[in-house]
């Protein structure tokens, strides 16, 4: 489904806030230089340190800037299963092509039942 160079996108900050103008420049640079897809909000993009609003806006901005020219694989993983589901549903509803969901780190679910929580077919 995916092939080629699909970099994890850094999240630029300025004065302790996400710098969305610089994010647009980074995304444009990656697209203009031949990336075959983009992965915003992975751990390289500082996802564990982002607020929920920042996380969602970065996904939305990436989808807007790519404008369907290349796939967007949204980083939606979290230690919190319900948060991962929320991020994944948001990514799907915003137009992401796929989601990158990491296995919970630092703590683990006590059983497989967390996998039976309501999700969309997108997960």
Regions found by a protein language model. Give the residues of each.
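Onset of an N-terminal alpha helix
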Residues: 2-3, 20
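Active-site beta->alpha loop and helix N-cap motifs at the rims of alpha/beta catalytic domains
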Residues: 14, 20-115
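Single conserved hydrophobic/aromatic residue that forms the stacking wall/gate
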Residues: 114-123
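Generic N-terminal amphipathic, Lys/Arg-enriched alpha-helix
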Residues: 3-14, 41
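Residue-level preference for short coil/turn positions at secondary-structure junctions
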Residues: 1-2, 68
